[in-house]
């Protein structure tokens, strides 16, 4: 019973609504720039077959166009974006410690952070000279927090290659 009522409401004044939509003004093409018009006339005079190619409809492309679905959303107003940018507090930066590595294009590093090369070098320094490169000295040198340096030294290690000497055992001969 509900479908009958809804169908009646949906089909009410259907012809007038359809006629109104059909008789609406269609959007016109945006005007071309004067320099573009002269270039188009020049190209069409050089290649007259292009004009027919432009007017011809390609059924394959039209069928592909029917499958396209566009979902658009309004962009975020610029006022909200500017407000979000101003909320961030300015960060303090420091220069990288290793200037001999030219592969890295890092100009400045935020305080409290280190680059990968700095992390590898401080891990290697701590491994080679643990008495001089203590966690306190590393934290002071690279402007890091003490707990972060302790965690770094505890859980990370540099890559190490160990070569084991060959053993003098006789191989079992296959039969």
Swiss-Prot record:
Membrane topology value: Lipid-anchor
Record Pfam families: UPF0240
Keyword Lipoprotein among record annotations: yes
Signal peptide segment: none
Lipid attachment locations (N-myristoyl glycine): 2
Reported modifications of this chain: Phosphorylated on serine. Prolactin stimulate serine phosphorylation.
GO biological process assignments: mitochondrial respiratory chain complex I assembly
Coiled coil, from the record: none
UniProt subcellular location: Mitochondrion; Membrane
Major place of residence: mitochondrion
Subunit text: Binds calmodulin. Interacts with NDUFAF3.
Main function: May be involved in cell proliferation and survival of hormone-dependent tumor cells. Involved in the assembly of mitochondrial NADH:ubiquinone oxidoreductase complex (complex I).
Protein name: NADH dehydrogenase [ubiquinone] 1 alpha subcomplex assembly factor 4
Organism encoding this protein: Pongo abelii (Sumatran orangutan)
Lineage: Eukaryota, Metazoa, Chordata, Craniata, Vertebrata
